[in-house]
Each structure stands twice: as C-alpha cells, then as structure tokens.
A protein has these predicted regions:
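Kelch-like beta-propeller repeat domains
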Residues: 1-239
Length: 239
C-alpha cells in the first residue's frame, strides 16, 4: 500500500496506511543501513501543500495517500494519484502528478488537480496535448520504457460518472510534461477484448481492473491479474 522507489544504493518510501494515511518520505541507504526522514509530516491524514504547478518549493508536499502509481526518471522519483487527501481535508481519488528531487529535497506538483475525484480529460486518442490528464484513480500500473511512462487501468474516474474500474492506457513524457491517451475506453467498467490467444491485434484490450501487477521486459509492458471488485483474474497481457 505504500510507495517505493530505488535510485542507486538508496530506497525511497512514501505514504501508505494503517487505517490512517501517511505523507512522510523516507530514504534508506543500503550502504550504511540507515533510515533518514526527509519530508512530510509525522502526523497522519495530512492535506497536500501544492504550491504553484511546475515550481519546486521547500514547502510543497503531496497529501497523505496510498495505492499511488510510481516511476523513476533522471534520478528523480514520480508519484501519480492514489487514494488520499487533496489540498483540503477531504479524502478521495487523486490525479495529481508529483516529482521529488533527492538533490534538492523538494517536491514539485507537475500536473493534475489539487481536488479529489477529478474526471479524465482524454482529448483525441494518440494525440499529445497539454490539456490531457487521466482521471483520478488508485492502483493504476505505471512503467517506464525508452524515457516514456505508461499508465494502465486502476479504479477511479473516467470522462463521466462515478467511480469504476478502468482499462485506459496512457503515455506520459517527463521531458515535455504532456499526457497522451493511447488505447482503451475513456469510460469506466468495460469488458476486455481478448481476441485470439497469443496473437497481437489492434482491437485487443484487457478488461477494466485494479490491484493488477505489471513489469517490463524487452521494451514491452506486461500486466497480470487484478480484480473487477470481486473474483481475481489470472490473465497476462503484453503491450
């Protein structure tokens, strides 16, 4: 439920829950076997301090949360969404994207909203746009391939309606701070299109799900299992 990153010989840990929610950031040094508390509060259920979008500041910090999506890029750690607290005292699904720079010990709010339960702005499929943003969600799977980050699924908000399971695929470019909707429906609760076993097809798409597992191999994105809010899947998908 907490978020972990690895850069060099250090591991970074943020947030999580024990029925209350945390926003403390810790660093563990594998060389010295020591922990360091870097940022955030030692009090639970804290709201985020967003500051100005795109501007790093010592006062910025994400709100307490769990089940966020994460990746690393250019020796910085990134945090997207999750279930937690916005800039107020309200808890819900988030779609904010944050960058933490270990060199400065500062957070930067990059994109998304400082509110909860925001709907997605998908734009046109396969067309990058500065106005695009995935809907708020928890448990989406994020992986980086060739300096681009890919986000699949989770449980949250599509372009309309209430909370549901998602099966949209997004690309985020850290160099431009722009999102692109690549595949999958822009609505929630959709069944998948499996096609023929082992055969790639443009019409194929995994069913909507969350709590899935993902990894990369040879510049491909793999998704395994997950749940539609009940029985669990045991399918493996390659993108």
């Amino acid at each position: 439920s907490l978020m972990l990153w690895n850069i060099g010989n250090k591991i970074y840990m943020f947030g999580g829950t024990n029925f209350d929610y945390f926003n403390d950031l810790w660093e563990y040094d594998l060389t010295t076997n020591n922990w360091t508390w870097l940022r955030g509060s030692n009090i639970v259920n804290q709201s985020g301090v967003y500051g100005i979008k795109g501007v790093s500041a010592a006062t910025n910090t994400p709100g307490a949360r769990w089940l966020s999506s994460t990746f690393t890029y250019n020796n910085k750690i990134y945090l997207f969404g999750g279930d937690g607290y916005n800039s107020g005292s309200t808890r819900g699904q988030l779609n904010d994207l944050w960058e933490y720079d270990p060199a400065t010990n500062n957070w930067t709010w990059l994109s998304g909203d400082d509110a909860i339960n925001s709907l997605g702005i998908h734009g046109t499929i396969a067309v990058p746009s500065a106005t695009n943003i995935p809907g708020a969600r928890q448990s989406g799977q994020m992986q980086i391939i060739n300096n681009k980050t890919y986000l699949f699924g989770g449980r949250g908000f599509a372009i309309s309606g209430g909370i549901s399971n998602l099966n949209d695929m997004w690309e985020y470019d850290p160099a431009t701070n722009i999102w692109t909707w690549l595949k999958g429906p822009n609505t929630g609760g959709n069944a998948g299109v499996a096609g023929a076993y082992g055969i790639e097809n443009a019409a194929n798409n995994p069913s909507a799900r969350y709590y899935e597992t993902s990894w990369t191999l040879n510049n491909k994105f793999y998704v395994f299992s997950g749940t539609p809010f009940g029985p669990e899947y045991n399918d493996v998908w390659e993108y």
